Amino acid sequence: IDECRMLHFGTLSLTDEPARSATQAAVEYARRRGKLISFDPNLREPLWPSLDAAAEQMLWGLKNADVVKISGEEAEFLFGCGCEKSAELILNDCGAKLVMITLGSEGCFIKNRAAFRRRA
């Protein structure tokens, strides 16, 4: 971690201990050292004891990331709204600097303080 410029993680390592604690410690260590943090919440329902547990860990990841790549379905699951509003919540409430919401065959929505949409 000391030698990297960016640390990327996803929710698969947040499902169970001891991987969860190790991932959280790595993210916190990297943040203290000024590394860029990238997060991809990949909701795989069968891996979680409950959807509440999944949401809790996904939100932890969002609040600790600078760059977020999330699907439209995952954003809907967490925030109950469309991609533009979800991106605003991730930027403003969670503190990310850049959000990419994938939209399948419709391309993706990318937002920092300016936004654009591209077809795949």
PLM feature spans:
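Conserved phosphate-binding/catalytic loop of the ribokinase/pfkB sugar-kinase fold
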Residues: I1-S21
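Active-site beta-loop-alpha junctions enriched in small/polar residues
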Residues: L12, N42-P46, E73, G104
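Charged helix-capping and loop-helix junction motifs
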Residues: R20-A26, L51-L59, C81-L89
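Conserved phosphate-binding/catalytic region of the ribokinase-like
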Residues: E28-R32, C83-A120
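Structural recognition of alpha->loop->beta junctions
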Residues: D52-F77
